[in-house]
C-alpha cells in the first residue's frame, strides 16, 4: 500500500512539473543575433532557441517576457520572470542576490568602424578619438580610465542603431558593442560600409541568472545548461543565429 501511494505521488509530481511554466526574460537591448523582437514579442534569435530547448529538456511550458534592464531586479523578486540570460556577475552591484548559471559562452567588446577609415588595431590608437557607447554601461578598466582622463571622448547613446547613424555621419570614430551583434549587423547590411576592427577591448563570459521562484531546482537548470555547453548545443545555436534569415 505504501509503495502504491509513493508511486502515485511520484506520478502526480511529474505531472505537476510538466504543467509548470518557466518564465524566461529577454532584454530588448540585446538585439540580434540574441533577440528578434516584433511588437514586444520574442520571435527569434539565440535567446528564444535557448529557452525553447531548456524548457523542453526540463519538461516545462515556456513563456517569454520582455524585460528592460532596469526591470530585471523587480521582475525577479516578484516572480514575473524566473530566468534571464546574457549577463555577467561583474555587471551586477549585488551578484549574490541571484544564482548564476555555469558560463555559457564568451563575448567581447569590440569596435565598429567605417570601411573608409584605417582599422584600429591597438588601444593607443584610440587616444583623441570619440567612441559611441551605451548609456550607463561600464567598460574595461583601461577604457574607463581613459574616458575619465579625457584621453578618449565618450559619446553615450541609447542603442546600437543610434551609434550606427552617428558613424555614418562621421560624428564618431568608432562604436563599442559586443562582437556578435556587430558581426550580425555587418553581415546583414554590407551596404552600410561598416566593419568590426581587430582590437578586442574586453572579453567576458556570459551567464543566466535565476530568481528565487524558479519552478525547478537550480541544480536541474544548471545541469541542463552545462550539458548544452558540453555537447556543443550552445555553440551551434549561436552560430545558427548569426546566419542570414532564410527567404520565405
What feature does the model see in each segment?
Residues 2-7:
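N-terminal export leaders
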Residues 20-90, 95-96, 156, 221, ...:
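Extracytoplasmic small-molecule ligand-binding "clamshell" domains
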Residues 27-30, 106-110, 187-226, 244-248:
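Periplasmic-binding protein-like
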Residues 61, 138-152, 194, 226-248:
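Ligand-binding clefts/hinges and TM-proximal coupling segments of bilobed small-molecule sensing domains
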Residues 65, 70-82, 99, 124-125, ...:
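Short helices/loops that flank or line small-molecule/ion binding pockets
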Residues 113-131:
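Flexible hinge/capping segments at coil-to-helix
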Amino acid at each position: 500500500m505504501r509503495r502504491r501511494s509513493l508511486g502515485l505521488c511520484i506520478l502526480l509530481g511529474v505531472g505537476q512539473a510538466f504543467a509548470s511554466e518557466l518564465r524566461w526574460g529577454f532584454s530588448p537591448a540585446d538585439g540580434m543575433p540574441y533577440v528578434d523582437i516584433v511588437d514586444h514579442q520574442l520571435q527569434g534569435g539565440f535567446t528564444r532557441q535557448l529557452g525553447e530547448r531548456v524548457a523542453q529538456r526540463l519538461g516545462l511550458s515556456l513563456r517569454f517576457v520582455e524585460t528592460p534592464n532596469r526591470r530585471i531586479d523587480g521582475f525577479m523578486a516578484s516572480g514575473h520572470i524566473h530566468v534571464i540570460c546574457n549577463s555577467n556577475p561583474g555587471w551586477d552591484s549585488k551578484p549574490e542576490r541571484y544564482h548564476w548559471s555555469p558560463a555559457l559562452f564568451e563575448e567581447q567588446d569590440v569596435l565598429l568602424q567605417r570601411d573608409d577609415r584605417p582599422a584600429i588595431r591597438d588601444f593607443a590608437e584610440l587616444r583623441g578619438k570619440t567612441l559611441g557607447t551605451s548609456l550607463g554601461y561600464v567598460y574595461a578598466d583601461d577604457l574607463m580610465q581613459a574616458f575619465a582622463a579625457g584621453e578618449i571622448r565618450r559619446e553615450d547613446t541609447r542603442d546600437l542603431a543610434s551609434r550606427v547613424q552617428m558613424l555614418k555621419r562621421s560624428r564618431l570614430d568608432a562604436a563599442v558593442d559586443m562582437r556578435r551583434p556587430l558581426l550580425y549587423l555587418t553581415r546583414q547590411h554590407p551596404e552600410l560600409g561598416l566593419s568590426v576592427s581587430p582590437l578586442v577591448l574586453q572579453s567576458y563570459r556570459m551567464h543566466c541568472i535565476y530568481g528565487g521562484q524558479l519552478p525547478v531546482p537550480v541544480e536541474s537548470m544548471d545541469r541542463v545548461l552545462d550539458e548544452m555547453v558540453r555537447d556543443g548545443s550552445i555553440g551551434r545555436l549561436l552560430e545558427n543565429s548569426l546566419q542570414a534569415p532564410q527567404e520565405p
